[in-house]
């Protein structure tokens, strides 16, 4: 098992407006009034578009897939990324649980940081269940990165 993620506190913002922790991993920012950063909000949207069918609403888990809000407490960004890209198979207690490889799914991979920071915010209880009520505006850099990743020429 890889090194745990460490303190999720944001210590800096990169050129794309993403928040990073002391180890340089993507993390969330929640203001005292509950306003979340754009990427955490985007992660909520992307998680509920691509991940919640198996892993349950709000990262809470289901009968056949773990609660990711709990998993990311023990999983650093590199480990999370590797599992999402390559998949994972658990053989234990008479059950086979399979996480499919999603490395070719642009609807996941173009937003992998966003999904991770959303789950980190949920795991730290920085945000509750449901859609965040307030969020920062979408940075222009997020739009440019999205268009480049998805192949949109507009």
Which residue ranges define each predicted feature?
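Axial heme c-ligation environment in periplasmic c-type cytochrome domains
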Residues: 3-9, 62-69, 87-115, 119-140
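The canonical Cys-X-X-Cys-His
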Residues: 47-57, 80, 84, 99, ...
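Short, low-complexity, Pro/Ser/Thr/Gly-rich segments in the mature regions of secreted, periplasmic
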Residues: 136-154
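Secreted/processed peptides and extracellular or luminal domains of membrane proteins
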Residues: 57-60, 130, 154
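Solvent-exposed, acidic/flexible segments
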Residues: 36, 40, 44, 73, ...
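Sequence context surrounding c-type heme c attachment/ligation sites in exported
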Residues: 41-52, 61, 74-81, 132-134
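Secretory pathway export signals and precursors
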Residues: 47-50, 106, 145
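Electrostatic cytochrome c docking/interface patches
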Residues: 6-46, 153
């Amino acid at each position: 098992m890889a090194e745990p993620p460490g303190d999720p506190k944001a210590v800096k913002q990169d050129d794309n407006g993403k928040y990073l922790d002391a180890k340089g991993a993507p993390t969330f920012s929640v203001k005292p009034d509950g306003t979340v950063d754009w990427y955490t909000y985007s992660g909520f949207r992307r998680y509920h578009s691509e991940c919640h069918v198996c892993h349950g609403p709000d990262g809470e888990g289901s009968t056949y897939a773990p609660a990711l809000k709990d998993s990311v407490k023990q999983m650093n960004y590199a480990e999370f990324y590797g599992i999402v890209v390559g998949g994972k198979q658990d053989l234990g207690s008479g059950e086979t649980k399979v996480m499919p490889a999603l490395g070719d799914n642009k609807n996941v991979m173009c937003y992998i940081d966003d999904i991770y920071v959303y789950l980190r915010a949920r795991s730290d209880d920085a945000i509750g269940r449901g859609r965040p009520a307030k969020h920062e505006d979408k940075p222009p850099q997020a739009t440019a990165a999205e268009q480049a990743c998805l192949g949109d020429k507009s």
